[in-house]
Every structure is written in C-alpha cells, then in structure tokens.
Curated annotation (Swiss-Prot):
Name assigned to this protein: Probable ABC transporter permease protein RP096
Its membrane topology: Multi-pass membrane protein
Superkingdom of source: Bacteria
InterPro entries with a match to the protein in the record: ABC_MlaE_roteobac, Permease_MalE
Location in or out of the cell: Cell inner membrane
Spans traversing the lipid bilayer: 13-35, 49-69, 148-168, 195-215, 237-257
Predominant location: membrane
A single GO molecular function term of this UniProt record: phospholipid transporter activity
One Pfam family, short name: MlaE
Amino acid sequence: MLLKIAHLVGKHTIKFAQSVGIFSLFSFIAISSIIKPPLYLSLIIRQLLFIGFHSLPVVAMTTFFSGAVLALQSYTGFSRFSAENSIATVVVLSLTRELGPVLAGLIVAGRVGASIAAEIATMRVTEQVDALYTLSTDPIKYLVCPRVIAAIITMPCLVLIGDIIGVMGGYLVGIYKLDFNSTAYLTSTFQYLEPIDVISGLIKATVFGFIISIISCYSGYYSGKGAKGVGRATTSAVVNSSILILISNYLITELFFKV
C-alpha cells in the first residue's frame, strides 16, 4: 500500500516537474521570439480588437456594478461607526489597487483564455500547426507572439477604463441612493488617491495579460488528441490562469504595499 502511494506521488511529482520545465522553455522561446522579425502586425491588430475591444463591454459592466455594490456594502458597514465619509476613498482604492485588475483579469481569462486555448488546440488536432512548419513558419512566432503582445497592451487599457467606470458606479450610488453631496463625494474620492495606487493596478494588469496569454497558448499548443484534448486544454487554460492571477496579485501587492 505504501509503495503504491509512493509510486503515485512520485509519478505525479515527475509529471508536474516535467510540465513546469516544458512551460518555462515555451515561455522563454515565446518571449525571445517577440523581438525577432517578422512582426505579423495584422495578426497583432486582430488580437488587439479581440482581446481588448470585444472584452470591454463585459469588463465595463462588471466593474460598474462592483463599484456600485462596494459603495452600498461600505455604507452598510461604515454607518455603524459613523465613518460614511470614507466610502468614496474605500471604493476608489479598492478598485484601483485590487478589484479592477483582478476582476478584469478573471473575466478576460474566462472569455479570451478559453478561446485562445480552444483555437490553438483545434489547430494542433487538425495538424494545422504542423502545416506551418512545412511553410517555413515558426508556429510560436505566428500563433503565440501576437496574442501575448496584444494581451500585454490591452489589459492595462481595460483595467484603466474599468477603474473609471467602477468609480462612476460607486459615485452614482453614493449620490442618488445614499444622498451624498456630489462635491464632497468627489473630493473624498481623489483626496487620498496616489499615483502608486493606479500604477500598481496597471502593473498587475500587464502581468495578468502575460499570464493569460502565455498559459492559454501553452495549453492549446500542447493539447491532447481529439475533442477531449481540446476540452481539457480549454479548462486547463482558464483554471490555471485564474489561479496564477490570484497568486501573482498577492505577490505584487506585497511588493508595492508592504505592511
């Protein structure tokens, strides 16, 4: 019994270490290929539209209602301590530091990550990736680099727009639902907001964009055979991206805001 358990643990440990090694090599090749010609500008523009513009409505709606709910919940809690004047500050700091980047990252991971993994996995199953080799085209340069570049560019833009819309959601609830004075609310919003709060959120967004794109491409590129392989690649891309987003979010927060 103990030998079986040890064998099982060792088997999964070796498999995990092998996956980490392959992923590290894949990431290194992808990063080094970004600076090499050709650039495939048309593919980058196409991915910019897909990852950024088409994700904007979902991100905007999510951050708007998150800001609105945050204002309501903050009022419910802070009113017990007569600290209602701090609601605007809590809303803007929570959105710019944490909620904006994390929510946008998880949404893009679910929407874009699944699509990227499924698309590349389907190309792998139908041997389109192998066909690129016969055309003297580097599959990683052609399939991975445009998506990584587009994700790194668009994620900070999505987060910045989402932060603004989320603050607007909190503002509208504060003014029309909680009867705050408009001028006082806006003053409280920007009184304690510092550049580092916004910058840290944008850096998180950039890291999240890289995580989503590289993991999704990796999951699709090394997918299994058949429809089952495509499904597993899609699930793996979303789950692993979401987990790494939350882990990296803590690490970046620890780096910028040490207690």
